[in-house]
Amino acid sequence: SFMAMTVVTVLWVLVAFGLCFGPSIGGIIGDPTKNFMFQGVTITSAWELAPTIPFLLFAFFQAKFAIITPALITGAFAERIRFWAYLLFMVLFILFIYAPLCHMTWHPDGLFFQWGVLDFAGGTVVHMSAGWAALAGAIFLGKRKVQKVNPARITYVLLGTGLLWFGWFGFNAGSAVGANGLAAQALATTTVAAAAAGMAWVFFDKILGHKVSAMGACIGAVVG
């Protein structure tokens, strides 16, 4: 999934950003020629729905959503497909699934946007598309040949949970595209939801007679 940072970033600069946020073509996809190679994406211009931040900053903020989406899918077929096939999958996924869905949902002239669909921080564009793609990949590949699963290293789990929890502040609060009340509400909701879910998971482990563990608290926090 680390390769998603390299492949998707380059693809984003080349054409994917234009496909997502360029002038709308039928409300389905953007015109890639408008912002090809980031033409017109400068620090002196701004996206129409984010007038308080530079266009270049907005473009790279959105790039992080595009990067994380195929990375989320990786777990469904990790170690079961060839490396080059995975790279090809990422390119095709971004161009033919992520870009149209992003444009229709987040572009003011997009089809879903015009219908009133609200996706504040990627519930549809990121998580739904990644979930369905992962499910399709898992069904196509079938069960793993090796069923043995090595125990997770709790140190890495704790570190990953902390990074993920903190990183979600950027995704959720940052989606307000400004230092404003909406960003504060998103940050507060993210914090309380993760904390409450982590605590609830620990309590339910205790009630059900399971061993209370840091692993359970981490799983609960991520679920929240």
Regions found by a protein language model. Name each.
Residues 1-224:
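Hydrophobic alpha-helical transmembrane bundles of multi-pass membrane proteins
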